[in-house]
């Protein structure tokens, strides 16, 4: 019996030595998995649907709240409403419904998409439903959000939805061409935060360096 145990130990010894040597000196490097995309959720905890409409609701209360809506830009000669605004209070009117149009089939966090006001309109104003970022406003020294964008093919019309560091979500503007003029696009992904600036007494969505707008999405 003792002889059998001795022989068994001799047989196992090379395996144990090889295993220890391989583990300590030559670890197995398994390929790292790509992070699973996280779906963006609405106020009911449902995943956003590209075929549904949503109101963009500011999380703040009182003067810090207010839905996002389509309105006429001050001093604009556009034939249709062409500005992206936020109402001055959370007890104000309901916002204008929007539709999120992803480059893929689903709406995930931190992925490129277009935003479109989803409302009936005349043929002349069809393109004035699509969000974009305008040129640098010399008076306000910022870039204002406006409409007149192009779905799926314009640097000025690409956005992302990311988790807020506080609560809810933030909107980012992310042109895919690095040479595109965007002095506010300073993070590693060449994106800029969307916040609020005051234009002629109205709260206008604009690119900001700090204090991004925290929002939720309510299905219409």
Curated annotation (Swiss-Prot):
Family: Belongs to the protease inhibitor I3 (leguminous Kunitz-type inhibitor) family.
Record-linked Gene3D superfamilies: 2.80.10.50
Pfam families: Kunitz_legume
A GO molecular function held by the record: aspartic-type endopeptidase inhibitor activity
Signal peptide region: 1-23
Name of protein: Aspartic protease inhibitor 4
Keyword Chloroplast listed: no
Glycosylation positions in this chain: 51
Induction: By jasmonate.
């Amino acid at each position: 019996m003792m002889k059998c145990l001795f022989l068994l130990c001799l047989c196992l010894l090379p395996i144990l030595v090889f295993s220890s040597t391989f583990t300590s000196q030559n670890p197995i490097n398994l390929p790292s998995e790509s992070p699973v995309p996280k779906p963006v959720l609405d106020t009911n905890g449902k995943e956003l649907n590209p075929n549904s409409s949503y109101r963009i609701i500011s999380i703040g209360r009182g003067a810090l709240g207010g839905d996002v809506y389509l309105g006429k830009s001050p001093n604009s000669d556009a034939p249709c409403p062409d500005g992206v605004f936020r109402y001055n209070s959370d007890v104000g009117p309901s916002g204008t419904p929007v539709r999120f149009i992803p480059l893929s089939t689903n709406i995930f966090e931190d992925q490129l998409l277009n935003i479109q006001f989803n409302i009936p309109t005349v043929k002349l104003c069809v393109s004035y439903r699509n969000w974009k970022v305008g040129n640098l406003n010399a008076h306000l020294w910022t870039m204002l959000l406006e409409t007149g964008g192009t779905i799926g093919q314009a640097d000025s019309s690409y956005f992302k939805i990311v988790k807020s560091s506080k609560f809810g979500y933030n909107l980012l503007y992310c042109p895919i061409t690095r040479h595109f003029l965007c002095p506010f696009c300073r993070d590693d992904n060449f994106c800029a935060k969307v916040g609020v600036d005051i234009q002629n007494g109205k709260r206008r969505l604009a690119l900001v360096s700090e204090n991004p707008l925290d929002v939720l999405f309510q299905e219409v």
